[in-house]
A protein has these predicted regions:
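Structural signature of nuclease core domains in nucleic-acid processing machines
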Residues: 434-562
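Phosphate-binding site recognition
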Residues: 1-455, 470-472
């Protein structure tokens, strides 16, 4: 019986995936397209965890000249059907740098990580360099300084171009340069407050490695964003940018419908096709329908072990979420209103800036939508030409991303509401002042973003959040009591003095809000919700019925309150 291939979670080394008999979604024809492109430098921009590192690893193993052949890795792969392209296999020196680990809280710490990356790449080529009679003594000394991490700070600005020159001399062949997640250090520096220092370092390295490097055969870079206004790519005449808006290479990153269907069939999970589409599909790369590969693989691995495993957001821990949440939490009222509409399924229309920079996000509100699009939080559903510019219509791609937006809103709400002094509000609850309670809740509702597709859950979470921190009391939510489920109980922690019952209803119109508050109060009585409190010997029971209609509320005190 043939061994079932492993699902490769977090494995970004192409050789390891093949050697360990992991399931591999064949993207090798990307190599053919790369050779046909004729570009000196090509930049792929895709969201985080969309297979960029794995694809660059595949490119490295294809082109790199090594002592032991790696040609077997491409046996029976799509590229093997093209002998004219297989002739390029194992023919070039390759420099591979992944900057995704440069996420430290200070520039100094990030620079130390960069030095480690340079050291590792020099070590990887040390044998070839020192065994060659083509390397001058002064250059060998400089190589040693990089390996020992004793090079001058200024020398690191040209470290990549220096290594490419040495390798080109050793192999008598120009170098292929691969730089993965080039903008992670910039994103991190933006979030941590040392953006200018980092952009100066990256600019210096790229200028020497990509613009004025006569030893370069071609370069491939990956990242989320195209950062050009800081002059990283200025003057690079033969730069080809392939963003999510371009048709070129549109299926090279992420999984197509066909690839997902084949994988589900392989693991006997075809019945999950509709669910996985709802949760993890929805991306539109150059008009191609694309699934999030990280989330799809994680779910397939989980479901392969337990077919009843629930769908969950696997992508929520990506680094860009920190900035997305910050953008939403710190945005103006107009932006919050648009986010609210997005969550409720209403598209946003905006011009898109392909060269948006992290430094511009705070000062240009239009850049927010560009950032959200390129980092995977929006997808294009339509575009039209307006005043010779492209106006894009965008929506949230799938349920997984929708949940991330909702979590951001909860965080925003918590920060703003919980920072207020709520003692007067709590006092109003105990003093049975329904009008005052209504006023507080109404004001808070007006300030927060709402989403209404799961109305009761939203308002339930809203009020539970408001009531958290009620000193001397604890919030108990959604439990069986009497003949049914109540919405919220507030119980005194000491002495079993006071218990408070909240029941919510959604009113279809503003005019019916009082009626629905009465219905909520009647439900408390009909279902005997107070039974649990009576059993626990609470001496005083207060009952509130609350109706909600979007950002309006109506609070009513039960006449049967003690």
């Amino acid at each position: 019986m043939q061994e079932i291939k492993k699902v490769p979670i977090g494995i970004e080394d192409f050789k390891k995936i093949i050697d360990k008999n992991c399931y591999f979604v064949d993207k090798t024809l990307m190599i053919k397209d790369l050779l046909n492109s004729g570009a000196d430098v090509i930049l792929f921009t895709r969201p985080r965890r969309f297979g960029k590192t794995l694809n660059l690893s595949m490119i490295k193993y294809f082109f790199e000249k090594t002592e032991e052949s790696n040609a077997y890795l491409f046996d029976n792969k799509n590229i093997s059907k093209y002998p004219e392209y297989m002739a390029y296999q194992g023919q070039y020196p390759v420099i591979f740098l992944s900057l995704k680990s440069m996420k430290q809280p200070t520039f100094e710490e990030s620079f130390e990580v960069f030095k480690e990356l340079i050291k590792f790449e020099f070590l990887r080529h040390k044998k070839a360099i020192f065994n060659s009679n083509k390397t001058e003594k002064t250059n060998l000394d400089k190589v040693s300084r990089f390996i020992e991490m004793k090079a001058d700070k200024a020398e690191y600005n040209t470290s990549v171009s220096f290594l490419s020159k040495i390798l080109a001399d050793v192999y008598n062949k120009k170098v292929i340069l691969l730089i993965d997640e080039y903008d992670v250090p910039l994103e991190n520096a933006y979030a941590c407050g040392f953006y200018e220092k980092m952009i100066n370092l990256v600019r210096s390295v790229f200028e020497s490695a990509l613009k004025t490097n006569s030893s370069l055969e071609f370069g491939v870079l990956t990242g989320c964003m195209r950062v050009s206004k800081e002059s990283i790519f200025t003057g690079l005449n033969n730069l080809m940018v392939c963003s999510i808006l371009n048709a070129e290479f549109n299926t090279a990153f992420g999984f197509t419908q066909k690839e997902i269907d084949e994988m589900l069939e392989y693991y006997q999970l075809s019945e999950k096709q509709k669910d996985i589409k709802k949760w993890y599909d929805g991306y539109n790369f150059g008009r191609a329908e694309i699934y999030n590969p990280w989330s799809a693989l994680n779910y397939i691995k989980t479901a392969n072990a337990d077919k009843n495993a629930p769908m969950i957001p696997y992508w929520s821990n990506t680094s860009s979420n920190i900035i997305v949440k910050r953008l939403i939490e710190e945005s103006d009222e107009e932006t919050k209103a648009v986010v609210e509409e997005l969550i409720n399924g209403v598209p946003v229309e905006s011009y898109i800036y392909e060269d948006v920079t992290y430094g511009e996000i705070d000062v240009n509100s239009n850049c927010i939508w560009s950032f959200l699009l390129f980092t995977g939080y929006l997808k294009v559903i339509d575009r039209q030409s307006v005043n010779n510019r492209q106006l894009y219509k965008m929506v949230i791609p799938n349920l997984e991303i929708k949940i991330i937006y909702e979590d951001s809103i909860v965080n925003w709400f918590d920060k703003n509401i919980k920072s207020e002094n709520r003692d007067d509000f709590f006092k109003s609850v105990l003093e049975k002042d329904a009008d005052k309670i209504n006023k507080y809740i109404q004001n808070w509702l007006a300030d927060t973003i709402s989403y209404y597709d799961e109305k009761e859950n939203y308002y339930h979470g809203f009020l539970a959040g408001v009531l958290t921190g009620f000193k001397g009391y604890r919030v108990v939510s959604n439990r069986e009591s009497g003949n049914g489920r109540y919405d919220l109980f507030i119980k005194s922690r000491i002495g079993r003095n006071t218990g408070i019952i909240f029941e919510f209803k959604i009113s279809p119109t503003e005019d019916e809000m009082e009626t629905y508050a009465d219905i909520a109060l009647q439900q408390i009585e009909d279902r005997n919700y107070e039974q649990e409190l009576r059993n626990d010997r609470y001496q005083k029971i207060i009952k509130y019925g609350i109706s909600f209609c979007e950002k309006l509320c109506y609070v009513k005190l039960s006449p049967y309150s003690d």
